[in-house]
């Protein structure tokens, strides 16, 4: 069938690239579609960021990640994944957002829009969704959240020197941002609705933040929720019911992110109403939609602390092993021509 790919991967992050590598190794015709740039989520990380994990755990395709540090930097990771894509000659279409995934006659029709909102369609026998979770922040849903002074993504600290900055959240992203802002001369207030910092904060970061809070270098408001955001101040409420008005120039609402469950449901994937975990065979990672596979953090639902690059990078082997087996069965049954090796 002309123009039909054996495998179409949605997402060119590390997990999507790992899936593409395995498909290419299996001799399957492949297309990867990415809404942004290569490893788009990693590109949006703060420029000076260092990963929490070792370089070996970021490696895919048996290619080593060279780094002068035990934990690689953002710049080193971006260079590495460019080399991966080039080494394996992965066919990637950038700036194409997948809008629909349908299989009306057993062949998937994938509808996309390019950077200029022009529609186009691709067809594939199997689809792998590896879209991650970094695109959709967990919103506060409060007045003023849409003000220009509010961001759900931390960038870098210099612009906030001698400014009053609120960091909302109590996990790794909030901890790193609060410390970085303070070290670059910002007046930082950390606001967290829980009574203490998250236990998931990395062991070398948490004591640093706790000490800065203890010495009052960083103001911390625990068991506190932001109720309103205004141009020059924010309104917060303590667990006791006390309402405070905190002077403020900028807000980083680092309250986590979630996968695009609506996109999955639009593709026919069943999503649990409580855990938001999509229906997925744990052995093959095939969803309830035949031929539609899920890879990476999206299979964990709301529990985004369960899967990271270091374990999601192995999903491609599981998925392509199942696809290859089914392709061979179809070839033997005479229902599919053998893939061109």
Regions found by a protein language model. Give the residues of each.
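FAD-binding core/adjacent interface of flavoenzyme oxidoreductases
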Residues: 1-10, 25, 40, 44, ...
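Rossmann-like dinucleotide/flavin-binding elements
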Residues: 2-5, 9-35, 153-198, 283-331
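Beta1-alpha1 glycine-rich phosphate/pyrophosphate-binding loop at the start
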Residues: 5, 12-90, 175-204, 272-274
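Short glycine-/acidic-enriched loop or helix-start segments at secondary-structure transitions
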Residues: 19, 42, 103, 138-140, ...
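Short, glycine/charged-enriched secondary-structure capping and boundary segments
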Residues: 23, 45-49, 107, 141-145, ...
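A non-catalytic, amphipathic alpha-helix used as a structural packing/dimerization or gating element
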Residues: 79, 211, 314-318
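A Rossmann-like FAD-binding core segment of flavoenzymes
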Residues: 87-114, 121-124, 183-275, 331-341
